[in-house]
Design a protein with these regions (language model features):
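Bacterial N-terminal signal peptides
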Residues: 5-14
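Carbohydrate-active catalytic/glycan-binding domains of CAZyme proteins
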Residues: 20-154
Length: 154
């Protein structure tokens, strides 16, 4: 009986592994939901539209006219492919997971500050992007604001 149980466990592990490896990543598409399940959200309002930015592979974006029904925008503000090269130079091991965005308006522009880091290390950076309007898909990379140093703990 024990041999049969062990055999079953190995077969199950093999099936699970094959299934996980055989999966293909589906491209993200625009969709609408009444539950905005996001991390570290920050919201801004412009011209009758609420814009919610959040942690993700790049800066995620959802929009709403009523704050009840949210539309996910694929690629967000700064999608996985739009992350500036300086982030990888400043943060060794950075894997495009941008977190804790914050937004503010100054001098007739919108500004988003965001964090880049490598899990388990003390090297991080804060970047800044800007745009004259929230509705644009094009944001300007304003570069790095500050970085931490690996050899310092404070």
């Amino acid at each position: 009986m024990l041999r049969l149980l062990v055999l079953f466990c190995f077969i199950e592990m093999g099936v699970t592994t094959m299934t996980a490896q055989g999966r293909t990543r589906r491209p993200m598409t625009e969709f609408t939901t009444d539950t905005a399940m996001v991390h570290d959200p920050v919201m801004a309002y412009e011209d009758g539209v609420y814009y919610m930015f959040s942690t993700g592979m790049g800066i995620q974006l959802m929009t709403s006219s009523d704050r009840r029904s949210w539309t996910f925008k694929p690629g967000g503000v700064m999608g996985r492919d739009g992350i500036p090269a300086w982030t990888h130079d400043s943060v060794p091991g950075f894997r495009n997971h941008v977190w804790a965005p914050d937004i503010f308006r100054f001098n007739n522009r919108w500004w988003i500050a965001y964090s880049c880091s490598t899990f388990g290390r003390n090297t991080s950076a804060i970047g800044l992007i800007s745009s004259p309007t929230l509705a644009t898909p094009q944001w300007t990379d304003e570069g790095c604001v500050i970085t931490s140093r690996q050899d310092r703990n404070n």
